[in-house]
Amino acid sequence: MDSQKEALQRIISTLANKSDEIQNFIDTLNHTLKGVQENSSNILSELDEEFDSLYSILDDVKESMISTIKQEQVRKSQELQSQLSQCNNALENSEELLEFATRSLDIKEPEEFSKAARQIKDRVTMASAFRLSLKPKVSDNMTHLMVDFSQERQMLQTLKFLPVPKAPEIDPVECLVADNSVTVAWRMPEEDNKIDHFIMEYRKTNFDGLPRVKDERCWEVIDNIKGTEYTLSGLKFDSKYMNFRVRACNKAVAGDYSDPVTLETRALNFSLDNSSSHLNLKVEDSCVEWDPTGGKGQESKIKGKENKGSVHVTSLKKHTSGTPSPKRTSVGSRPPAVRGSRDRFTGESYTVLGDTAIENGQHYWEVKAQKDCKSYSVGVAYKTLGKFDQLGKTNTSWCVHVNSWLQNTFAAKHNNKVKALDVPVPEKIGVFCDFDGGQLSFYDAHSKQLLYSFKTKFTQPVVPGFMVWCGGLSLSTGMQVPSAVRTLQKSENGMTGSTSSLNNVTQ
């Protein structure tokens, strides 16, 4: 019966996954169909605009050429009209002179004839007919303004759609995810020397397989990539996967997207649990700050409602004036009713835990303290850590502790044992937890120098733990285990600092 139920559950799970996959594909088809309709409409509009632009250019050129022909016609006509007018005047003068000369032949008197002859000679000498060119200044030839658009017609007949680059092919084998960086590599299916650049798009997702159309996150765009490889660095891996796609572009147009590739980007993401922290801690998702006035507003509300309320408030004021040390602030200074739901830690345990438990695998996160922070601890603990317990003072917690209040100390702590660390306190501490391997190591986050390493066997899930007094801490999560740390872990066999080295060291 049980085996049949398990088999049925597997079948149900398989069917559910297949249904989800088909639904995602249906969404993709609908999205693609909508895109085809919208893009076709846009392309038709662009085509109309292009042809209208051609028509406009042709009309402009036609008008310009017509104007040139008409101007040439006017010029030649004016030249010929001017020459024609001159010829008519010369002809008229010549005919008058001819008539006068003909009449002079009939003169009988010698003196009068001689006078007429001299006049005719002078008029002939001055006659415009003898100075006039009888060659037209312009010809009627207009062939220099003829056109032959056969070549242009051939060019117009060769109009076609732009050559579109083929879709690139992303090579998952060549892609690399390491050190919170992702390198994506691709190639063209065939050589294309007209490609100018590539566009890569990516988005984060929590779904494996093909990208989902209804994914809440938008595609981010990296443009003008000249090579066939690109690296995104400095990422926060706050999702399980990332989708990538690439398209090639020539000088005019972008081609189709490559088939999308989904790369795994798992990393430990957690926030600080504000609901269970000490009341003297001001907690946000990724930072915690010590607040000596924490809970005062709530205490004032209950003042006068209890017989001993005034005593508690007076005691609290004495202890919170100035900057008290951890030893001077006690649980008795705040009535239990004030803490309400935030009584997970109290007394001198200025503790806040992460909201995500570690049950397996290797994980890494980093912590940075404020410059004026007096005291803080960073490590892990079982969920059973007591409300009065401080990190490192029980057998259920491991940490490194920094104190600069009375004297500067840097130590590893576990089970109320202390191991002084003879290394400078780094600006930022990296925490590496190998749950299955039973190892907790601390590093200088910048240089990746190993500070200390605990070797143990975790019997319960652990949660990141933090203590802070007079100062604050900021947290960086969503980080992969750095390559340098992985390399050091392979060479470091747990011999450098272990819990056994703390057994004989008193606090």
From Swiss-Prot:
It comes from the Eukaryota. Residues 292-345 are annotated as: Disordered. Residues 321-332 have a biased composition (Polar residues). The modification Phosphoserine is found at residues 498, 501. Keywords: Coiled coil, Phosphoprotein. Residues 291-484 form the B30.2/SPRY domain. Gene3D superfamilies: 1.20.5.170, 2.60.120.920, Immunoglobulins (2.60.40.10). Pfam families: fn3, SPRY. Residues 105-162 form the COS domain. Residues 164-268 form the Fibronectin type-III domain. The keyword Transit peptide does not apply. Residues 70-109 form a coiled coil. CDD domains: FN3, SPRY_PRY_FSD1. Residues 298-309 have a biased composition (Basic and acidic residues). This is FSD1-like protein. It comes from Mus musculus. The gene is Fsd1l.
